[in-house]
C-alpha cells in the first residue's frame, strides 16, 4: 500500500513547478505511507528538480511518463530514459500510458532498461490489454527478480497477479 502523488487524476499538468514541489513536501507531512511522486514533464531540469525534492522528503520512488507531447520512436524512448536514469538519484518507475503519450514503452525496452539501471524498480503499465502487461512481466523477469510490474487499470489487477505481476497502481 502507498500513495501516488500527482498522477493523471491528480492533474499534474495543471500545476506550476512551485505547486508541485509544495505538494511533494505537504504530502510527506500528512502520511507515513510509502509515497511515489509523478515527476513527468516536458523539461528534464524540472523533472530532476521534482525528483530531488521527492527523494529529499524520503519518497520511496518517482515515476515518469515518456515525453507526452511529441511521440517518440523506440530509439528515442531509450535515449530519453537513459538520460532520466542517469539523473534520478533514487528508485524510479516508468509510467507507460500510450493513449496519452502517443508512444509505447514495450517489453523489450523495459527489460533492457531494467538490466541497465538497478534503481529502475518498475513500471506502471496503463494499457487496455492484459497481454501487454504480461509480456512486460515475462521480459523483466528474465533480467531481474526484484522488478515490479503494476497495471494501471483496476480491472486488470487480478489478471496481472495471475500472470506474475505485482498489482495495480491506480
What feature does the model see in each segment?
Residues 1-104:
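Active-site beta->alpha loop and helix N-cap motifs at the rims of alpha/beta catalytic domains
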Amino acid at each position: 500500500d502507498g500513495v501516488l502523488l500527482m498522477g493523471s487524476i491528480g492533474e499534474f499538468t495543471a500545476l506550476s513547478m512551485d505547486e508541485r514541489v509544495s505538494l511533494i513536501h505537504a504530502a510527506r507531512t500528512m502520511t507515513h505511507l510509502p509515497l511515489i511522486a509523478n515527476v513527468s514533464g516536458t523539461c528534464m531540469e524540472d523533472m530532476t528538480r521534482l525528483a530531488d525534492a521527492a527523494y529529499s522528503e524520503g519518497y520511496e520512488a518517482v515515476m515518469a511518463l515518456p515525453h507526452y507531447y511529441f511521440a517518440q520512436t523506440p530509439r528515442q524512448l531509450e535515449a530519453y530514459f537513459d538520460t532520466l536514469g542517469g539523473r534520478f538519484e533514487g528508485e524510479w518507475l516508468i509510467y507507460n500510458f500510450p493513449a496519452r503519450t502517443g508512444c509505447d514503452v514495450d517489453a523489450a525496452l523495459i527489460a533492457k532498461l531494467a538490466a541497465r539501471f538497478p534503481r529502475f524498480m518498475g513500471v506502471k503499465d496503463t494499457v487496455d490489454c492484459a497481454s501487454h502487461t504480461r509480456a512486460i512481466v515475462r521480459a523483466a523477469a528474465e533480467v531481474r527478480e526484484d522488478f515490479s510490474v503494476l497495471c494501471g487499470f483496476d480491472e486488470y489487477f487480478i489478471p496481472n497477479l495471475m500472470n506474475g505481476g505485482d498489482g495495480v497502481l491506480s
